[in-house]
UniProtKB/Swiss-Prot annotation:
It is an enzyme of class 6 (ligase). Pfam families: Arginosuc_syn_C, Arginosuc_synth. It catalyses: L-citrulline + L-aspartate + ATP = 2-(N(omega)-L-arginino)succinate + AMP + diphosphate + H(+). SUPFAM superfamilies: Adenine nucleotide alpha hydrolases-like, Argininosuccinate synthetase, C-terminal domain. One of its GO terms (molecular function) is ATP binding. This is Argininosuccinate synthase. The gene is argG. It is found in: Cytoplasm. InterPro entries: Arginosuc_syn_C (IPR048268), Arginosuc_syn_N (IPR048267), Arginosuc_synth (IPR001518), Arginosuc_synth_CS (IPR018223), Arginosuc_synth_type_1_subfam (IPR023434), AS_cat/multimer_dom_body (IPR024074), Rossmann-like_a/b/a_fold (IPR014729). ATP binds at A11, Y12, S13, G14, G15, L16, D17, T18, S19, A38, G121. Pathway: Amino-acid biosynthesis; L-arginine biosynthesis; L-arginine from L-ornithine and carbamoyl phosphate: step 2/3. Its EC number is 6.3.4.5. Homotetramer.
Length: 409
């Protein structure tokens, strides 16, 4: 504490940990606490967070609860899916993409109420502390950041419970013991980590899953759907136009019912350790296959291949917390430019955990059936043209072959 903090904006869920943090900020810093609770589609009633904050002495004018579902999907999830961003080949970045928006709103509230500090509940071992704080510093370089898990001496669940009881913080009965795993959720995904999941050799228990049914229990008949895209963004399901958040919620329902989107992953954290997580991204898994499908017929080969080369870097930037960095914005500009003609419709079959692309159509399609057909047509491909193409591409290989022959290699 290098300077006296007067007012701090806390990212507040209303749960036990952030309620303890709230009281700890009051007692340790003597600061006025402002709470911010974001509705990102986590599926929880948020009014209890307001009542909990009031119970802990927070004035009504210092309690902020915002429905950010549309902004989250429109301005964060959809731009990321234009890139087909996947971290380490599998992770759809559901937790990572939520942190920049929360950080942005905290800074906006801090400026509105005249706060000189922000605080979060991320631990000192994970990626979220980095993601939050990179966002804070990018948007308000002079802000003071308080990370209680890196400062306090509450090192065990027993100590946390004792602190809560000492300060009359309500504790749900199921929170008195160690939780079997921790959960983070928003409209894009639900992730579970820790405790029963820490041994990567052990199968994930059934009770961990919250957003998907077991693929083996999914219907024996497939579900067919169509998704319409306009300039890279999904806009309709089965012909019905929807807002971004409503559309993703509908895809979540469809994915859940068909056992789609489960991922058991050991990932490389930015902070240097490996961690195991159980991710459920039903709607996102469908959206990724659909977007790739419409790109197959609307993107030029060179643009498509360049996008594929850039994607891992884009995904890494999002995962590591560099959403507000110039390099992410540069990549986004290039990706968005590539999406000008990514408009059309894809047809999908959802079946027992699988998303199967069965059709795609676009007024901007680059697919020419007359060129690829084995039958003769009006503009049929002349097979003889291939000989010169192959010889020119083989020129350097033939030259190398001549050298090997000359040297007896």
């Amino acid at each position: 504490m290098s300077k006296k903090v007067q007012k701090v904006v806390l990212a507040y869920s209303g749960g036990l940990d952030t309620s303890i943090i709230l009281k700890w900020l009051q007692t340790t810093y003597g600061a006025e606490v402002v709470t911010f609770t974001a509705d990102l589609g986590q599926g929880e009633e948020l009014e209890p967070a307001r009542r909990k904050a009031q119970l802990l002495g927070i004035k009504d004018e210092n309690i902020f609860i915002e429905d950010l579902r549309e902004e989250f999907v429109r301005d964060y999830v959809f731009p990321m899916f234009r890139a087909n961003a996947v971290y380490e080949g599998q992770y759809l970045l559901g937790t990572s993409i939520a942190r920049p928006l929360i950080a942005k709103k905290q800074i906006e509230i801090a400026e509105k109420v005249g706060a000189d500090a922000v605080a979060h509940g991320a631990t000192g071992k994970g990626n979220d502390q980095v993601r939050f704080e990179l966002g804070y510093y990018a948007l308000k370089p002079d802000i003071t950041i308080i990370a209680p898990w890196r400062e306090w001496d509450l090192r065990s669940r027993e100590q946390l419970i004792a602190f809560a009881e000492q300060h009359q913080i309500p504790i749900a009965k199921d929170k008195r013991g160690e939780a079997p795993f921790s959960v983070d959720a928003n409209l894009l995904h639900a992730s579970s980590e820790g405790k029963v999941l820490e041994d990567p050799a052990q199968e994930v228990p059934d009770y961990v899953y919250s957003r998907t049914i077991d693929p083996e229990a999914a219907p024996d008949q497939p579900t067919y759907i169509t998704i319409d895209f306009e300039q890279g963004d999904a806009v309709a399901i089965d012909g019905g136009k929807m807002s971004p958040a409503t559309l993703l919620a509908k895809l979540n329902e469809l994915g859940r019912a068909n056992g789609i989107g489960r991922l058991d992953l050991v990932e490389n954290r930015f902070v240097g350790m490996k961690s195991r997580g159980m991710y459920e991204t039903p709607g996102g898994a469908i959206l990724l296959v659909a977007h790739r499908g419409i790109e197959q017929i609307t993107l030029d080969r060179g643009a498509a291949h360049l996008k594929d080369e850039l994607m891992p870097k884009y995904a890494e930037l999002v995962y590591n917390g560099f959403w507000f960095s110039p390099e992410r914005e540069m990549l986004q500009a290039a990706i968005d430019q590539s999406q000008r003609y990514v408009t059309g419709q894809v047809r999908l079959k959802l079946y027992k955990g699988n998303v199967i692309l069965v059709g795609r159509d676009s007024a901007y399609s680059l697919y020419d059936q007359d060129l690829v057909t084995f039958e003769e047509g009006a503009v049929a491909y002349d097979h003889r043209d291939a000989a010169g193409f192959i010889k020119l591409n083989a020129l350097r290989l033939r030259t190398l072959g001549q050298r090997r022959k000359k040297l007896g290699l």
